[in-house]
Structures are given as structure tokens and as C-alpha cells.
Amino acid sequence: MGIYAITGASSGIGAKTKELLIQQGHKVINIDLKDGDICVNLASQEGRQSAVDQLHTMCPDGLDGMICNAGVSGACGNLGLIISLNYFGTVAVANGVYDLLKKKHGSCVVTVSNTISQGAGRKDIVDLLNNIGDEKRVLSLISSMDSTNLSVGNSLYVSTKYALARWVRRVSATWAANGVRINAVAPGNVHTAMTATMSTTAKMALNALPIPTKYGQECLMAPEEIAEVMVFLASDSEIGRAHV
């Protein structure tokens, strides 16, 4: 069967995705801050490079799939972490294993967002992430922002996720030309540790939106619902290319 790597597979959607892939007989490599097969800090350049290097050592014949799922919410209280992990960590790992995916004509799946509201992000941050890609410059720009202001954190979260969706679209044609599919998944609000940090106001707004799921009247989806989509997109069953 196949060999898949997942960032952030120690809990939440990543853990359910790992579980489902293992049930299907695949080998799964969990990359996480702790309790992973590869334990690194993907918010740091050193951690990202270490993860990529270890994957190249462990999978010399290639990867069937890379699922970039690790991320933090806007309520984490660390603005630099939001930028470095959500955007730069994801892009660096995906680019770092691109050659491994080419060897098997594999697939890359990127978790784009749990919560994106039109207009909630900062276009200047999105443009800097996509068009400049200078992590130090972005971190310097946000260093004077108020990390205790939840709206600031949420705005940066949305910005990183918009930038990821845009990045996926930009690279999709080149990757597809080399036999590698790349897709993005926007899960929405899911029962995870991330959504457990939602403010009372956010929870009230969520309760006012009767979004149907296969579980009926639940306001939040179960992680396994998203895991099924992730596994489908990472598998050979997915014949389309470059979807968000």
C-alpha cells in the first residue's frame, strides 16, 4: 500500500485522517510538535528543514501523499506562530517533499481554513505572504500588533488561510504537469481543540447558523467527516486536479 505523511496528526482532523489511512492498510508518518514519528517545530525554519530531511531519508522511493494539516487558531495568543506555522510551515513542507511526490505521482492536500469570513483578513498581509514570501519581514510588520486582541489574531489567521488557498492555485498547474495533484480543503467548524477556544460571541454566531451535516442538527462537524475528504483527495480515487 501507500506511504503518507501528515503534519499535525496527533489530534483532531489529522489524527482521524491518520486512523483512516491506517485502516486502509497504508503506512502513515506523523509530523508533529510532540507524540509524532517526526517531532519538530514547524513554526521554525530549522524544524521544517529537519522534517523534510527526515522524510527524504525515510522515503527514498517517494511519497504517495502529503497532508499538510498542522496549524493554530487566531485565539492562540501568539501572532508570530499564526504566521510561521499556518503559512510558512505548510508551504515549506509541501515544497520540500515535492520531489518525493513526483516519484510516485502522488498528491498533496492542504488544510486551508476552519473559519474564513470575506473581508476579515488583511490584504496587505496576504500579498506579502504570496508575493514576497519574506517571513522575517512579515513577522517584523506584525510585531507591534496587539496579541491580546482576539480580532487581530483572527484577522491574521484568515490572512494566512487566504494566502494558502491562493498559493495552492498558483502552483497547481506546474505540479499537475509533473504528475502531482494538489488540493485544498476548507473544513469549516469542526469539533477539535482549535474550535474549543472559540469566544462566547463566536459560539453564539455559530449556533445561529443551521448548517446541515450528516449528523443532523449539530453545529460543528465531527473530525472524521473531514478526514474522509482528506483521504479521498490524497488517494488515486481523486481524478480531478487543483480544487479548493
Predicted regions and their residues:
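N-terminal Rossmann NAD(P)H-binding glycine-rich loop of SDR-like oxidoreductase domains
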Residues: 10, 14-19
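Short, flexible catalytic-loop segment of classical short-chain dehydrogenase/reductase
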Residues: 186-197, 201
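C-terminal helical subdomain
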Residues: 92, 165, 184, 205-241
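Rossmann-fold cofactor-recognition segment
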Residues: 33-47
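Catalytic loop of short-chain dehydrogenase/reductase
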Residues: 72-76, 106-177, 189-192
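Hydrophobic structural elements of the Rossmann-like NAD(P)H-binding subdomain
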Residues: 67, 110-112, 182-185, 195
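Conserved Rossmann-fold cofactor-binding substructure of NAD(P)-dependent oxidoreductases
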Residues: 43-60
